[in-house]
């Protein structure tokens, strides 16, 4: 079983990208399960030498990096629509990494924000869950804002199996999807409707839930804490 890990990154206005990205990458390469490839996509990262300096420290055979020549959402929204930027910034880069992963033969894809990180057992727990349940979509327990343990909405002991994603109900860095079985990408809802709807990840979970139900697929919540997202990395820049 092999995993693709997709990370999109950009040069933050607060200058914290190098330290946060290094923490994220360290967490990936410290995984106990090693059969993965990381696809890092620069969303028009302005100082590419800064990125090369960071990634030079990691195993190049497990690493793919590409810097896009344009940042579709940030170029469009940064000076005109901050809410659209926060909701949909990086969608094009994330989707680019997903499609690149699929074209390279990966179907189990994990999305990891460049300021989130995993505990060493994250991929191992997902692998075991998929082997035991044949789930097409899984997520793990996360922490969010000062060690707050984040559980999906309305979770009970009886809902671990066939747990369905929903908007606002999970941290997307805790999710792994089989994109061969669930061929859905992130969307810029504002670009489609000219209104601020659900953020890109929440929109994807709503569509994913419907797809899982309509196609009788299996989904699962892993009741183990393996993913971190907190205020240190939080930014709308």
Task: Give the positions of each predicted feature.
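Short beta-strand/loop segment that forms part of the nucleotide-sugar
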Residues: 36-45, 66-70
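Short beta-strand-to-loop acidic/aromatic patch adjacent to the donor-nucleotide binding site
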Residues: 106-115
């Amino acid at each position: 079983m092999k995993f693709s890990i997709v990370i999109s990154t950009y040069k933050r206005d607060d200058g914290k990208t190098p330290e946060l990205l290094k923490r994220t990458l360290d967490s990936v390469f410290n995984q106990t399960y090693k059969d993965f490839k990381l696809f890092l996509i620069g969303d028009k990262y302005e100082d590419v030498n800064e990125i090369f300096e960071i990634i030079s420290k990691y195993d190049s055979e497990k690493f793919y990096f590409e810097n896009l020549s344009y940042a579709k959402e940030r170029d469009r929204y940064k000076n005109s629509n901050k809410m659209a930027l926060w909701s949909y910034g990086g969608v094009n880069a994330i989707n680019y990494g997903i499609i690149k992963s699929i074209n390279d033969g990966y179907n189990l894809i994990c999305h990891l924000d460049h300021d989130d990180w995993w505990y060493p057992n994250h991929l191992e727990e997902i692998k075991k869950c998929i082997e035991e349940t044949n789930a097409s979509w899984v997520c793990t327990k996360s922490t969010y804002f000062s060690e707050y343990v984040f559980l999906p909405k309305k979770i009970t002991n009886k809902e671990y199996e066939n747990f369905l994603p929903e908007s606002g109900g999970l941290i997307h860095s805790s999710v792994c999807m089989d994109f061969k079985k669930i061929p859905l990408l992130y969307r810029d809802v504002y670009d489609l409707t000219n209104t601020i709807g659900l953020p890109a990840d929440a929109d994807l979970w709503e569509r994913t839930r419907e797809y899982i139900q309509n196609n009788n697929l299996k989904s699962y919540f892993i009741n183990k804490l393996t993913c971190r997202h907190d205020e240190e990395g939080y930014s709308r820049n």
